[in-house]
């Protein structure tokens, strides 16, 4: 049994993404916690080492704020680039935290949001393939489709991590904690 823990502000944690079959998908080596509660974790990272399931590694190119919620089946990465804020949204299980890392199951579907507010649903073919290969239940499919709709509403309504104030507040908090 995994003992859950809530990460504390200023703490540095790993983020571990898994696939439905239990295999590790991707690991971010360092994310600084900006807010940690039972329901929401907000973190920041910059030039962070990422390790893929096949052991390949790469380093993130820009500062990012990450948003996880315990009641929604998605997480959001807000990436700060020269031409504006891009969002990469992963359809995923709600997060859990233990002493090792923040963890979630990646369910393939992604939404990319551009600085102008336009967005695209990505990886539908990968989702269909993995749904068959890993036997996603019909319940999970319904939950994920519902959360795609919720996520699209949040994007269109500029709610949660898509709100301009969210970006301003949490980017400043990250800079302060990291002494930028």
Swiss-Prot record:
Keywords carried by this UniProt record: Hydrolase, Magnesium, Metal-binding
EC number from the UniProt entry: 3.6.1.15, 3.6.1.6
One term of GO molecular function: magnesium ion binding
InterPro entries, sorted: DUF402, FomD-like_sf, Ntdp-like, SA1684
Cofactor list: Mg(2+)
Function: Has nucleoside phosphatase activity towards nucleoside triphosphates and nucleoside diphosphates.
PANTHER family: PTHR39159, UPF0374 PROTEIN YGAC
Annotated family: Belongs to the Ntdp family.
Name assigned to this protein: Nucleoside triphosphate/diphosphate phosphatase
Lineage of origin: Bacteria, Bacillati, Bacillota, Bacilli, Bacillales
């Amino acid at each position: 049994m995994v003992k859950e823990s809530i990460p504390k502000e200023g703490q540095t944690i790993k983020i571990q993404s898994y696939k439905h079959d239990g295999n590790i998908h991707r690991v971010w080596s360092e994310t600084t916690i900006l807010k940690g509660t039972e329901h929401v974790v907000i973190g920041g990272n910059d030039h962070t080492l990422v390790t893929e399931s096949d052991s390949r590694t790469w380093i993130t190119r820009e500062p990012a704020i990450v948003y996880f919620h315990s009641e929604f089946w998605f997480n959001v990465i807000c990436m700060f680039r020269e031409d504006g804020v891009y969002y990469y949204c992963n359809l995923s299980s709600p997060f859990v935290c233990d002493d090792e890392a923040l963890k979630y199951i990646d369910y393939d579907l992604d939404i990319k949001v551009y600085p102008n507010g336009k967005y695209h649903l990505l990886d539908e073919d990968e989702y269909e393939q993995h749904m068959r290969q890993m036997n996603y239940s019909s319940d999970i499919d319904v939950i994920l489709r519902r959360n795609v709709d919720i996520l699209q509403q949040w994007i269109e309504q500029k709610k949660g991590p898509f709100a301009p104030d969210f970006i301003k507040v949490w980017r400043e908090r990250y800079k302060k904690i990291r002494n930028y």
